[in-house]
Amino acid sequence: MPSIGHRIVAQNAMLTGTVPPGSSSVIADLHPAYFAMVMATGIVSIAALLVGLHAVAVTLFPANVCFAFVLAALTILRIVRFPARVIADLSDHRRAVGFFTLVAATSVLGSQVLLITGLRSVATILWILAIVFWAALTYGVFTALTVTRSKPTLAEGINGGWLVAVVAPQSIVVLGVQLASGYGAYAEPVLFFCLAMWLGAGMLYIWIISLIFYRYTFFLLEPSDLAPP
């Protein structure tokens, strides 16, 4: 039975985002972009399937499912135990866009499920989840970055990782197009939705890549600036 003092320390840690002694700093410091592991593994698996390396694709699939479940569990645990850390990440220009890897990972995993197992129902659920995640994060992240009072300079705040905000909706498009043929009369609305998403993502790419080009061209560039955030 924890003492009153221990409970107070734990409550203060949740409110301030600090890690109390004995707690797992791994969970507290979990980077929002870690879902890139699921995204990357899924891409390699799908590529292997398309070039005829079926054994490689099938081997990577269960591994990727495990990665997804482990990261999802750690993320949920982090939200529950360290909500202040999560909120701080949402308004951090270097870390916030990492949340969009969740969208891309969900969509890529859905494509894996569809192409390797043929389970359209599971792939559809993952597609819907990806859309929900994308909508919530698009409004949540960019609103938080806009209204926060403490902002870095352009040189410090933007990096190549921001392009994952473009990859996220485009991954939804890829899975949506793969699923559209099975929706009968709803296929055309789904394809129209995918077209709109693709065009919107393309416009977002122009905005972001312009800022990245401007930052790399007109500001001092250090080797550390090319490292992951």
Language model features by range: what are they?
Residues 1-16:
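Short, intrinsically disordered terminal tails adjacent to the first/last structured region
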Residues 72, 209-219:
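Predominantly late transmembrane helices and immediately cytosolic-facing juxtamembrane segments
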Residues 42-49, 71-75:
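Alpha-helical transmembrane segments of multi-pass membrane proteins
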Residues 139-145:
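Membrane-water interface at the C-terminal end of transmembrane alpha helices
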Residues 47-58, 113-122, 176-192:
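Helix-coil boundary and interhelical linker segments in multi-pass alpha-helical membrane proteins
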Residues 68-86:
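Juxtamembrane transmembrane-helix boundary signature
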Residues 59-73, 122-136, 192-205:
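Structural signature of hydrophobic alpha-helical transmembrane segments
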Residues 15-46, 61, 83-111, 127-130, ...:
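Juxtamembrane helix-loop boundaries in multi-pass membrane proteins
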